Amino acid sequence: MEGYNILAVLIILVGVSMGQIPGGWIDANVGDTDVKEAARFATEAQSSRSNSLYHHKLLKIHKARTQVVSGINYEVFIETGTTTCKKSEVPLEDLKRCAVPENGVKHLCQAIVWVQAWIPRTKVTKLECQNKG
């Protein structure tokens, strides 16, 4: 039994010495396809949850991290903008054609998107936004 305790301590120490803790957050590449998808999903959630008449659009991914849980958590720090397209007139699929005015409202958001690909399930578990500048 003592051997298992020593092994557990060694595993934790190796993880800490490598800068990683099992189940901890790991920096992710903002250009990664899965990170981009999580950021897009978070932006759609922001748009649907807001009281604005207009869609929100992803402008930039500033930072991203991942965490292995029962699936993967993607924590994304994103910048979004309020577009000129009304939610009642333009479906989300056509959002690419919607512009964000130069002097329009922009937001900085922190979101956690939980993905369980084998189910499949994607859920925003945290979304906090504030107006930029």
Swiss-Prot record:
It is found in: Cytoplasmic granule. Keywords: Antibiotic, Antimicrobial, Disulfide bond, Protease inhibitor, Pyrrolidone carboxylic acid, Signal, Thiol protease inhibitor. InterPro entries: Cystatin_dom (IPR000010), Cystatin_sf (IPR046350), Prot_inh_cystat_CS (IPR018073). Its main location: cytoplasm. A motif (Secondary area of contact) lies at residues 67-71. Disulfide bonds join C85-C98, C109-C129. Expressed in hemocytes and slightly in heart. Belongs to the cystatin family. This is L-cystatin. It comes from Tachypleus tridentatus.
